[in-house]
């Protein structure tokens, strides 16, 4: 049996197309509402959080390294996430109980590269850009 052809088959075509859209990965992701349910950020691009601890995450094979990360508890909903701290020595600018701004890590909710289970990265510390601290253009505010 092929597809229905003829002058009064529009409803059948429309309904079939509506059903088949759900097989498309991107359509399903956009329309099922999992963006708000499953994503710790609740659909937002960034989120603020409090640093709980500094952690080292071992890189996946064949690489051998300890990637510097922090455990962050998000302010908006209390969820805990692991966020990567980019650049050499930037972990020294972050202390426990600091407020950090966390963003996605580039692969639309997936882990990046050889860092298993880490889907976020730190962008700001105490409302100062981590890049500015790294380049020594700005200093941490005195508390």
Curated annotation (Swiss-Prot):
InterPro entries: NA-bd_OB-fold, Ribosomal_uS12, Ribosomal_uS12_euk/arc
Keywords, ordered alphabetically: Cytoplasm, Endoplasmic reticulum, Hydroxylation, Ribonucleoprotein, Ribosomal protein
Endoplasmic reticulum keyword on record: yes
SUPFAM superfamilies: Nucleic acid-binding proteins
Subcellular location, record wording: Cytoplasm, Cytosol; Cytoplasm; Rough endoplasmic reticulum
Protein's GO biological process: cytoplasmic translation
Broad class of where this protein is predominantly found: cytoplasm
Protein encoded by which gene: RpS23
Modified residues (Hydroxyproline): 62
Species per Swiss-Prot/TrEMBL record: Papilio dardanus
Pfam families: Ribosom_S12_S23 (PF00164)
Record field: compositional bias (Basic residues): 1-19
Subunit structure and binding partners: Component of the 40S small ribosomal subunit.
Official protein name in the record: Small ribosomal subunit protein uS12
Similarity annotation: Belongs to the universal ribosomal protein uS12 family.
A GO CC annotation given for this chain: cytosolic small ribosomal subunit
Gene Ontology terms for molecular function: structural constituent of ribosome
Keyword Cytoplasm: yes
């Amino acid at each position: 049996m092929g597809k229905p052809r003829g002058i009064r088959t529009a409803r059948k075509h429309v309904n079939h197309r509506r059903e088949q859209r759900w097989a498309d990965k991107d359509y399903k992701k956009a329309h099922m509402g999992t963006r708000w349910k499953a994503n710790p950020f609740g659909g937002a691009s960034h989120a603020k959080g409090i640093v709980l601890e500094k952690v080292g995450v071992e890189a996946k094979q064949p690489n051998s390294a300890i990637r510097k990360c922090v455990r962050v508890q998000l302010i908006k909903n209390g969820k805990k996430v692991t966020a990567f701290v980019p650049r050499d020595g930037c972990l020294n600018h972050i202390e426990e109980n600091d407020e950090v701004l966390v963003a996605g890590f580039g692969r639309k909710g997936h882990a990046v590269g050889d860092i298993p289970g880490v889907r976020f990265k730190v962008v700001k510390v105490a409302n100062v850009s981590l890049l500015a601290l790294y380049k020594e253009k700005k200093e941490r505010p005195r508390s």
